[in-house]
Design a protein with these regions (language model features):
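Glycine-rich loop(s) and the adjacent beta-strand/alpha-helix scaffold that form part
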Residues: 37, 50-51, 58, 73, ...
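Residue-level detector of alpha-helix initiation sites
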Residues: 25-26, 223, 470
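N-terminal Rossmann-like FAD-binding beta1-loop-alpha1 element of flavoenzymes
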Residues: 17-44
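Redox-cofactor-proximal catalytic regions of oxidoreductases
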Residues: 61-135, 271, 350, 354-365, ...
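A glycine-rich dinucleotide-binding beta-alpha-beta segment and adjacent secondary-structure elements
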Residues: 175-190, 342-353, 358, 375-380, ...
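Conserved redox-cofactor binding core of oxidoreductases
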Residues: 72, 103-198, 407-408, 420-421, ...
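Extreme N-terminal leader/targeting segments of oxidoreductases
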Residues: 1-19, 37-38, 488, 496
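Mid-to-C-terminal "cap/lid" subdomains and adjacent gly/pro-rich loops that border
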Residues: 33, 215, 219-220, 226-345, ...
Length: 497
């Protein structure tokens, strides 16, 4: 059943549920769908509707006070399906290395290993509608310092609100309330357990509802999970789960940048026939004291690889640009030509950000329409973040030279050791992947994490957090596939088969 609470009178709210989930994005929908299959009675609270609306989206506005970043009401979406509604579809699991503790990276390591989520990979592939990943190998000629890696693309990208809408609408096991804004979390003063999620619609002076369940899950996204817990300070002044000042800290993103361009004598090489993405090996990361990263080597092709009309366009531009007189004549007739006669393609990076306690979500002094303080993002990087990018780019340039593939032009800002950070949005860079991670990190104890290995909040035995906010380290892989794996693992914890 799906009901918009601003239109339903009276609201068909059951007296109690097995599990109440706040957030109808990837994690929330996967949990609702799979828990229903285990016989659980589920309430799913989604603050938006079926489609984008300014009424809902405006509640995502906030401030950036650290490194320049996307506007907070642009980098995420607030309607059924969540940010999957503008997801690009890229998928890759985290590496074994990403879960481990590394001496050169402070506060690295998870309290779980890849073997704890590996059993859910095939089921996650089915949900994401992607095929299995091929075996990966060291890159020939790299001296064991680089490896070839692969990604899968969900095509078209799965829009979770659309994919599961029919099931959610017809299911007797799941109640979905749209326009249901979570505004408070009630605690039982004796047990410390969550006793209710308090929510309301958009109508001025409209009713306030309480959802009762045995267990509760917050699945609102990497920014909103932290903001919600920090705002839940009516009974716990410092915010729920924030006994050790960890909620909102360790905000991490993936650094996305163009690093340079490569030039080859031939537009097709033995390298271009195989690798498109490379990453440093574990040995290189340890030796160079860097984090994980994926480097995309784009634009290596031959004209024979392109079908008409792309083939003709590429050939024609190459001919026109080769002769300055012809180029001048054509430009007078049709306008400027984009000539890059000897440039084969670009080098770009999707790089891991290492954990940084001072990179965080705070609360603003400004309140939203429901009286909740808005988020403030203070995104901070560390020197190793730049070092990882610079070291990897130089290694790939050396690889091109050693193997007589061609030459590479690395941009000045990458090479400048005195420039500690990549350029920001004002210089035309994407800067990040719209991936919000780490703000309610998993820990072995409440001194180093907000949730335990089962995504249960320390000190609140019936409250769980789902999504990329529980990540301890982030690797370079896009987070959506791992979000689904962790949601399936949480499903098994909440409702063992």
């Amino acid at each position: 059943m799906i009901v918009d609470i601003d239109q339903a009178v009276p609201l068909p709210l059951a007296a109690g549920y097995d599990i109440c989930i706040a957030g109808g994005g990837v994690a929330g929908i996967v949990l609702a769908y799979t828990l229903a299959g285990r016989g659980k009675r589920i309430l799913l609270l989604e603050a938006g509707g079926y489609e984008f609306s300014e009424n809902s989206q405006s509640l995502y506005s906030g401030a950036n006070i650290g490194r320049e970043y996307f506007d907070l009401d642009v980098t995420r979406l607030r309607y059924l399906g969540g940010t999957s509604n503008h997801w690009g579809g890229a998928c890759r699991p985290l590496d074994v290395h990403d879960f481990k503790r590394h001496d050169h990276i402070d506060e690295s390591g998870w309290p779980i290993g890849i073997t704890d989520i590996q059993p859910y990979l095939s089921e996650a592939h089915e949900i994401m509608e992607i095929s299995d990943f091929p075996a990966e190998r060291a890159l020939n000629g790299s001296g064991g310092r680089l490896r070839e890696i692969s990604f899968r693309i969900s095509r078209p990208p799965v829009r979770f609100g659309e994919k599961y809408r029919e099931f959610l609408a017809s299911s007797d096991a799941v109640d979905v309330f749209l326009s249901a804004n979570l505004i408070d979390i009630d605690l039982d003063p004796d047990s410390g357990r969550v006793s209710a999620f308090t929510f309301r619609g958009y109508g001025e002076g409209g009713p306030i509802y309480k959802a009762y369940a045995d267990r509760y899950v917050i699945a609102l996204g990497g920014i909103e999970n932290a903001r919600t817990l920090l705002n839940a300070n009516r009974q716990v002044p410092q915010g729920l789960g924030n006994d050790h000042d960890l909620v909102g800290r360790y905000f991490m993103e993936h650094l996305h940048h163009t690093l340079g361009y490569h030039f080859t004598d031939s537009t097709k090489t033995r390298f271009g026939e195989t690798a498109r993405f490379v990453s440093p090996t574990v040995e290189m990361m340890r030796r160079e004291q860097i984090a994980n990263a994926a480097f995309a080597i784009g634009g290596i092709y031959s004209f024979d690889d392109w079908s008409f009309p792309a083939n003709v366009m590429l050939r024609s531009r190459a001919v026109l640009c080769a002769n300055e007189a012809v180029k001048d004549f054509v430009e007078r007739m049709i306008g400027p030509l984009r000539c890059r006669p000897d440039r084969s393609g670009s080098l770009s990076v999707f790089s891991e950000q290492i954990p940084n306690r001072n990179s965080r979500i705070r609360l603003s002094d400004e309140n939203d329409r429901f009286g909740l303080r808005r988020p403030v993002l203070d995104w901070q990087l560390l020197p190793m973040d730049k070092k990882t990018i610079r070291t990897g780019a130089l290694e790939i340039a050396k690889y091109f030279a050693r193997n007589d593939i061609g030459r590479m032009k690395i941009l000045d800002w990458v090479l400048d050791e005195n420039d500690p950070l990549p350029p920001g949005i004002d210089k035309g860079e994407q800067v990040g992947g719209n991936h919000h991670m780490g703000t309610t990190r998993m820990g072995a104890s409440r001194q180093d994490g907000v949730v335990d290995r089962d995504c249960r909040m320390f000190g609140v035995e019936n409250l769980y957090v789902a999504g990329s906010s529980v990540f301890c380290t982030v690797g370079h892989a896009h987070p959506t596939l791992t979000i689904v794996q962790l949601a399936l693992r949480l499903r098994d914890h909440l409702a063992p088969a």
